[in-house]
Amino acid sequence: TVLVVPAASPWRNLGELAEDAKRRPGAISYSSAGNFSALHTPMAMFTAAAGIDMLHVPFQGGGPALTALLGGTVQALASGTGPVMQHIQAGRLRALATTGATRVPGLPDVPTMAEAGYPDVLYLIWAGLFVPASTPAGLREQIRQAAARAAEDGDAQRALTTAGSPMAYLDGPAFEAFIREDAARLIPAVRRIGRVE
């Protein structure tokens, strides 16, 4: 995800936003697609790591959360890169940091949270293919091979990278290990947000 603010905002980098939020607890607001969503969790991770209090304003979806930022209802948003890329390129929004392990190819000048001083803020929006455990081994293998071919397709890679969502293909055991690592990182973050059963 990428943390964005209006281009007219006073914050030129993540440090300036954090310092302002420290001076004015609860005065700076951010929108999300709802509690525990992919737009809420990375902001909650950032505010915890920075030791700041920002007002969370949940909406019913990413579209309304982005509209609230563009309309001036809130002052910040952590979003997938796709929905905000055109607004960054048009100069309506300023990207302060990304939450991945590496910089986003479409935003090479935007630091990661780790580079900006928050190494514990690592949040990835990802998708994967899953099948029922009862799926025959032969069919599972066909699906894995088809997914690997699709991931190697140059046109698909370029389209996703242009949209701000580069593909990082992981197969079988590597993908399973990634899921376990991601869950281990996110469980404490989600528990800090609030009650989880």
Write out the residue ranges for each language-model feature.
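Mature extracytoplasmic/periplasmic domains
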Residues: 141, 156-176
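Extracellular/periplasmic bilobal clamshell ligand-binding domains
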Residues: 171-197
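C-terminal lobe and pocket-closing loops
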Residues: 84-152, 181-184
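Short beta-strand and adjacent tight-turn residues that come in two discontinuous sequence segments
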Residues: 59, 78-80, 98, 123, ...
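Alpha-to-beta junction loops
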Residues: 24-28, 52, 70-79, 92-95, ...
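Conserved functional loop/turn residues at catalytic and ligand-binding sites
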Residues: 13, 58, 72-73, 80, ...
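Hinge/capping helix and adjacent helix->loop/strand transition within the periplasmic-binding protein
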Residues: 1-64, 113, 126-159
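Short helices/loops that flank or line small-molecule/ion binding pockets
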Residues: 44-49, 63-77, 85-90, 180
